[in-house]
Amino acid sequence: METEDDLCNTNWGSSSSKSREPGSSDCGNSTFAGFTSQQKWEDASILDYEMGVEPGLQESIQANVDFLQGVRAQAWDPRTMLSNLSFMEQKIHQLQDLVHLLVGRGGQLQGRQDELAAQQQQLITTDLTSIIIQLISTAGSLLPSVKHNMSTAPGPFTGQPGSAVFPYVREANNVASQSQNNNNCGAREFDLPKPVLVDEREGHVVEEHEMKDEDDVEEGENLPPGSYEILQLEKEEILAPHTHFCTICGKGFKRDANLRMHMRGHGDEYKTAAALAKPNKESVPGSEPMLIKRYSCPFLGCKRNKEHKKFQPLKTILCVKNHYKRTHCDKSFTCSRCHTKKFSVIADLKTHEKHCGKNKWLCSCGTTFSRKDKLFGHIALFQGHTPAIPLEETKPSASTSTQRGSSEGGNNNQGMVGFNLGSASNANQETTQPGMTDGRICFEESFSPMNFDTCNFGGFHEFPRLMFDDSESSFQMLIANACGFSPRNVGESVSDTSL
């Protein structure tokens, strides 16, 4: 047998002998500390970043690592990120095995190829959607820590020359500086697609929503001073039900177009093209062009008021009315469905009532959305948030499955596989029945999350279990039936949510 000294000399060769004094037989030389940290993931030395870091940056990076360790729990942790990535890798492997299983079972069931193909495609699509959502959630968890590091941490984290940790921050600083210079010259603001910007001169993070106003979506024009005329209406004129009045009969109208249509009834002279034309639409040839009209809010201190240092004018009278009512008036219109939301503009109430009570997209935090893209945008911003199913949709299915299961207690006939995505009250019920002879797979909702309990990564629970998670996944049920495992008793699983 070879001695320990011989093994060390054989494995490491001349590189080990050069870094070691003659006569030394220690195999745990500090030269290979970086290699040891790569082999042991749980070792705390992985945070030292000893691999591939220049000696000049070692102290600076170590100072930033110590700073990150003292940040709140929501700060980015590389070990947690590694756990999350390994978690999703395990789920992808499970889905890959499921696809292999479906390919192998393709020739066993004849006569129902179209039905099985649609069901298998829906199964794979829902599991892929679950994986994508977890990936978006993991990426979204980096946003709070990146914003905190750019605003407070010095050194390589602020995009200085020689930065080795966040090199893209330097580009954001350059863009932010260019945007600030353009604003000083009166040019249009530069809107980044990024959620955060870094201001080098003031040293703080500027969020994207601070650069826009919620009242005017068409904002973006920066007219030079003197190129437009500022008009300011009084409060009584803004809140008046009618702003245009007939000079003959005195009838009031909300729009000037309605007034022009009304004037046709007072004589033929009001039916000409000149009388029906929009005012100030055509300028007289040879005359100077008229100044553009912009409007000011009469409320002092408002950003839309002409006395404000960052004055932003309103384009039309309708914009003035809507802005003043939304910002400076009481909300007197209440939704007749939810009796919770209040609005000051009747148009906003009508828009809300179109989807009120139909928020079928629910997040695990309890927030509801009327559109799926809004839900996914919310999930991408908040760590650990995942789609859920509204309780009002799952309660009837839970009661139906319980009644159906009690009536089929001893029946061992042809069964089917059902995916129960109900609420927490029926989360412990099994959703399988023995046999898969007809190959039917039933879906109650669009999401069928896989079983997350099959892989445990050192106690990290970055993706909390939702209230609709079942104790058995679609992948496990298909494996059990395909491998010929003994089916469970019908008395234990009495739920069928396919009908």
From Swiss-Prot:
How does a null allele present?
Hypersensitive to H(+) and Al(3+) rhizotoxicity, reduced induction of genes such as ALMT1 and MATE in response to acidic stress, and impaired Al-activated citrate exudation.
Q: Which chain segments does UniProt annotate as zinc-finger regions (C2H2-type)? A: 244-266, 354-385
Note the effect listed for C27G.
In strain: cv. Est-1
The signal peptide stretch is: none
Map out region (Disordered) in residue numbers: 1-31, 390-436
Q: What is the annotated localization of this protein?
A: Nucleus
Q: Which UniProt keywords apply?
A: Metal-binding, Nucleus, Repeat, Transcription, Transcription regulation, Zinc, Zinc-finger
Summarize induction of expression: By shock H(+) and Al(3+) treatments.
Q: Does the keyword field hold Amino-acid biosynthesis?
A: no
User: Can you supply one Gene Ontology CC term for this chain's record?
Assistant: nucleus
Q: Which domain of life is it from?
A: Eukaryota
Q: Does the record carry Repeat as a key word?
A: yes
Q: Which residues cross the membrane?
A: none
Tissues where the protein occurs: Expressed in roots (e.g. root tips and lateral roots), leaves, flowers (e.g. stigma, sepal, anther, and filament), stems, siliques and cotyledons.
- A matching Pfam family: zf-C2H2_STOP2_C
Indicate the impact reported for S60N.
In strain: cv. Est-1
Query: Could you provide one GO biological process annotation from this protein's UniProt record?
Result: response to acidic pH
State where it is primarily located. nucleus
Q: List the GO molecular function terms.
A: DNA-binding transcription factor activity; sequence-specific DNA binding; zinc ion binding
Bias (Polar residues) occurs at 396-415, 422-435
Role, per record: Probable transcription factor. Together with STOP2, plays a critical role in tolerance to major stress factors in acid soils such as proton H(+) and aluminum ion Al(3+). Required for the expression of genes in response to acidic stress (e.g. ALMT1 and MATE), and Al-activated citrate exudation.
Protein name per Swiss-Prot or TrEMBL: Protein SENSITIVE TO PROTON RHIZOTOXICITY 1
**Organism, as annotated:** Arabidopsis thaliana
